[in-house]
Amino acid sequence: MQTIEQLRSGALVGIRRLKLCCGLTRFPTEIYDLADTLEILDLSGNQLSELPEDLHRLKKLRIIFCSDNRFTELPAVLGRCAELSMVGFKANQIRRVPPASLPEKLRWLILTDNE
């Protein structure tokens, strides 16, 4: 697991996998500094309730985990992430899955322990 301090300092540039579990209430924009290499993003165990509309800037993102957060619906922005094939939003309060939130290359969708 990495820290927000490492992310902000630029120490993580070039990594392919990022796991941040540090009570985040908003998406750290510094993640975009990893846009050319990041393939796996794990933001589980935070307090997030939304993702930014420009998440698709993470061009190589294949896997995203946002379990144990505060989402009430699957974010529509996921549907605009061209390479995304695995989405995990376990243990949130998700009640709605808009069709637009499902990426074209989606193979695995994990939504257990939601409402």
Where are these regions (language model features)?
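Leucine-rich repeat
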Residues: 12, 33-37, 56-61, 79-84, ...
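Leucine-rich repeat domain C-terminal region
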Residues: 95-96, 102-115
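The feature encodes a structural signal of leucine-rich repeats
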Residues: 6, 27-32, 51-54, 74-77, ...
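N-terminal "cap/leader" segments of large eukaryotic alpha-helical scaffolds
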Residues: 1-4
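LRR N-terminal entry segment and analogous cap-like coil->beta motifs
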Residues: 8-49
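Conserved hydrophobic beta-strand positions in leucine-rich repeat
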Residues: 16-20, 39-43, 61-66, 84-89, ...
